[in-house]
């Protein structure tokens, strides 16, 4: 997300303490046996790290073909110079693919740091501030392929194969996918045995899923995906209730999941979005397995990708924003980009390339598209998409908030304790959250300090106008309602980050307006998780869009080089006629 607006609070109180490697012998994930926490505690002997050669879904078989394209053929065309606007995951994915094919790549980013929606930075007190909570499903094969390519496959921590719901009063519900037999039986067992729903709701839930395209996905994944696409014009709630599902199931289970996926609830989310996930969960054993980075995204995700790009000869230009896309119209009416008007503080320059990629978020691409281009339906459709506001809150405590079994353990600071996983809740304004001191310890566990809760407030609309202090006050109160045992623990540091438009709002009927990566403008391409690809708006979707953008560019390499020669000849002709090209461009 190269150009979204974000606002950061000043910490209420500075956190102090020496950073330390997550201690061996720290309590790990708690195992639950009923509506309340059981007395069993699984103690993790060491932080679980895993490479990406195991516990990953095989998306090359029995999966929709568009979700994980085959490796591209070796490019044999002319070497191209490509300018990419935006150093988010989509832009960097595009860059990696193009560099691997031998092209020359420059990435321009208006911010001082890279990563877009998966970016992070360090504040003046040394605290890592993230743009949101990032969780990796086991079916993120395009992203995992990228991480393996750049040498970051050891940077993800595998969590217990269960989805945990924290209800008011500290009551825990689960979708437990740990089962001796894999898909689809592990999923059936998880839904039938969940203690998050009452028996009647579970039965109606099972009926609804049995009547869904998810069943067809077991034998015909591409046909099922087409059926799922055809359901884009109805909300998930409308579809689910029409198949016999209950409102209680939506409120207690599916709304928190929907908020975590797309920052909107089931009443406002397309059935396509939710059913895409369900189909993968049903057919791929590891699709529902969660991973989280072992530390901050800037160090363990964006950092390795940036290094790979630079080692391959790619260049990053930070704080350079694109102010205007310069273009010309040929005699036949076709359009092409002639350059990008860039600026950095008081500096200005025109960037020229053979191909241009706008790897922006929804508000970013809307600002970038020339007004004239909106006469084309392709570009005008983009303006029918809107981003969802989201607020991310970090709270550092002087104890372990999610430790529910042992009050004394929750007060000591020698060892980390609590729930090490992504956590959902139907009973707070933050639908999903995690204790990063447990889940991503390398940067977030600090010796002598406690939990670092990262809470994602969705929908973020009601919180956008509030002061940071008021937001912290409300979130802290809701945390206490979920974890009454945390009474008496104090918040020692906090941060608030507001993003006016994050993921695009995946509401009913919006999928047809998502643009392809190839545009009607001959040398102008798009990338971004909002663009057309078979997954949802996500890290995986962003990575896949980058692969698709690169493929489109390589497929028309000869034409792009011919266009570049044509443009150069026209510019030389203008110069020979005494036209000052630089003056002309400066006036645009």
Swiss-Prot record:
Enzyme class per UniProt: oxidoreductase
GO biological process, one term: carotene biosynthetic process
Gene Ontology terms for molecular function: 9,9'-di-cis-zeta-carotene desaturase activity
Pathway where it operates: Carotenoid biosynthesis; lycopene biosynthesis
Signal sequence, start to end: none
Annotated compartments: Plastid, Chloroplast; Plastid, Chromoplast
Disulfide bonds: none
EC annotation from Swiss-Prot or TrEMBL: 1.3.5.6
Cofactor: NAD(+); NADP(+); FAD
Alphabetic keyword roster: Carotenoid biosynthesis, Chloroplast, Chromoplast, FAD, Flavoprotein, NAD, Oxidoreductase, Plastid, Transit peptide
KW Cytoplasm (keyword) present: no
Biological role stated in the UniProt entry: Catalyzes the conversion of zeta-carotene to lycopene via the intermediary of neurosporene.
Family note: Belongs to the zeta carotene desaturase family.
Protein name (database record): Zeta-carotene desaturase, chloroplastic/chromoplastic
Natural source organism: Solanum lycopersicum (Tomato)
Designated gene of the protein: ZDS
């Amino acid at each position: 997300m190269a150009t979204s607006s974000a606002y950061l609070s000043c910490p209420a109180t500075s956190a102090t303490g020496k950073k330390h490697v997550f201690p061996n012998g720290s309590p790990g994930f708690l195992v639950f046996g009923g509506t309340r926490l059981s007395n069993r505690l699984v103690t993790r002997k060491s932080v679980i790290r895993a490479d990406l050669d195991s516990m990953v879904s095989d998306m090359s078989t029995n999966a929709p073909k568009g979700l994980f394209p085959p490796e591209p053929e070796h490019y044999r065309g002319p070497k191209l110079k490509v300018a990419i606007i935006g150093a988010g995951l989509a832009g960097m994915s595009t860059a990696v693919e193009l560099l691997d094919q031998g092209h020359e790549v420059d990435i321009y980013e208006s911010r001082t740091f890279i990563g877009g929606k998966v970016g992070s930075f360090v504040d003046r007190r040394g605290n890592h501030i993230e743009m949101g909570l990032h969780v990796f499903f086991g079916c993120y094969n395009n992203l995992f392929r990228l991480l393996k390519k750049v040498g970051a496959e050891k940077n993800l921590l595998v969590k217990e194969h269960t989805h945990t719901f924290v209800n008011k009063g500290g009551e825990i519900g689960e979708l437990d996918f740990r089962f001796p037999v894999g898909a689809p039986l592990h999923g059936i067992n998880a839904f039938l045995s969940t203690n998050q729903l009452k028996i009647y709701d579970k039965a109606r839930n099972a009926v609804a899923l049995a009547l869904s395209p998810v069943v067809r996905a077991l034998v015909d994944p591409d046909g099922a995906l087409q059926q799922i696409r055809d359901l884009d014009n109805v909300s998930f709630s409308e579809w689910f209730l029409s198949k016999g599902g209950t409102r209680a199931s939506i409120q207690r289970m599916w709304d928190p999941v929907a908020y975590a996926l797309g920052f909107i609830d089931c009443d406002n989310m397309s059935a396509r979005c939710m059913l895409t996930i369900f189909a993968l969960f049903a057919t791929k054993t590891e699709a529902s397995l969660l991973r989280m980075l072992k530390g901050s995204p800037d160090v363990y995700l964006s950092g390795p990708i940036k290094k790979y790009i630079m080692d391959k000869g790619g260049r990053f230009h930070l704080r350079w924003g694109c102010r205007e896309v310069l273009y010309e119209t040929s005699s036949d009416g076709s359009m092409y980009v002639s350059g990008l008007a860039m600026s950095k503080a008081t500096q200005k320059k025109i960037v020229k390339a053979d191909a241009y990629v706008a790897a922006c978020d929804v508000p970013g691409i809307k600002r970038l598209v020339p007004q004239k281009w909106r006469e084309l339906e392709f570009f005008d459709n983009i303006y029918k998409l809107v981003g969802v506001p989201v607020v991310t809150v970090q709270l550092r405590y002087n104890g372990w908030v999610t430790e529910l079994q042992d009050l004394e353990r929750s007060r000591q600071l020698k060892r980390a304790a609590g729930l090490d996983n992504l956590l959902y809740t139907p009973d707070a304004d933050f639908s999903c959250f995690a204790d990063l001191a447990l889940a991503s310890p390398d940067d977030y566990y600090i010796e002598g300090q406690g939990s670092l809760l990262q809470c994602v407030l969705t929908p973020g609309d009601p919180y956008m106008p509030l002061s940071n202090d008021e937001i912290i006050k409300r979130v802290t109160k809701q945390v206490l309602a979920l974890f009454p045992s945390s009474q008496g623990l104090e918040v020692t540091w906090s941060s608030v980050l507001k993003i006016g438009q994050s993921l695009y709002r995946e509401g009913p009927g919006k999928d047809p307006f998502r643009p392809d990566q190839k545009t009607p403008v001959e040398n102008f391409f798009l990338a971004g998780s909002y663009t057309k690809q078979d997954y949802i708006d996500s890290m995986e979707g962003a990575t896949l869009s980058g692969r698709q953008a690169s493929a489109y560019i390589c497929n028309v390499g000869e034409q792009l080089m011919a266009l570049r020669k044509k443009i150069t000849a026209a510019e030389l002709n203008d110069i020979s006629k005494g036209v000052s090209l630089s003056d002309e461009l400066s006036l645009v």
